[in-house]
A protein has these predicted regions:
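Charge-rich, solvent-exposed alpha-helical interaction surfaces
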Residues: 18, 36-37, 41, 67, ...
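Short, locally clustered residues in the helix-turn-helix/winged-helix DNA-binding domain
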Residues: 23, 112, 139
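Short, positively charged interaction helices/loops
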Residues: 43-95, 142-150
Length: 150
């Protein structure tokens, strides 16, 4: 089996509640549900290719508007940011361990570099945080349809 890349991430209470509700239905853990949803979304993203994965309301998005069918459109940076927690509170905001193949992590790194969101890259261009891509993928999943971002 290929070596996995582990990424730890804190999710907002609202995202955790949705994942927790689904985990209770499936009689499993939040991390298991999150990993399954992310694998589904990554499959969709990788199928269309990185050049057709865009964040809404960006110049890349506007360039694709005539041809959005067959693209993967993430919510806006502001919408995603509302569902990212930065509190270092393990009791209320415990980390979730997410697992990806090396190929998937490289694909996501390409998207992070393409998005150029402040705080996600180091000065040398390497990835500091995947949180906008990961939370964006979760919010895109039909399980989060009630958020009104799909």
């Amino acid at each position: 089996m290929a070596k996995e890349v582990k990424i730890n991430l804190r999710l907002s209470m609202r995202v955790r509640e949705v994942l927790n509700d689904e985990a209770e239905v499936e009689d499993t853990r939040i991390g298991t549900v999150a990993n399954r949803l992310l694998q589904e979304e990554l499959g969709r993203m990788m199928a269309v290719g990185a050049d057709r994965c865009v964040m809404k309301d960006t110049k890349e998005y506007r360039a694709l508007i005539p041809h959005l069918e067959g693209s993967y459109v993430l919510p806006t940076e502001l919408e995603i940011n509302r569902h990212i927690t930065t509190r270092l509170d393990d009791k209320n905001y415990p980390q979730v361990s997410l697992y990806f193949t090396k190929e998937q992590a490289e694909f996501m790194a390409g998207l992070v570099k393409k998005q150029r969101i402040r705080g996600t890259l180091y000065y040398d261009g390497s990835v500091k945080s995947y949180r906008y891509v990961i939370v964006g993928m979760l919010l895109k999943n039909p399980l989060f349809a009630d958020f009104g971002l799909n």
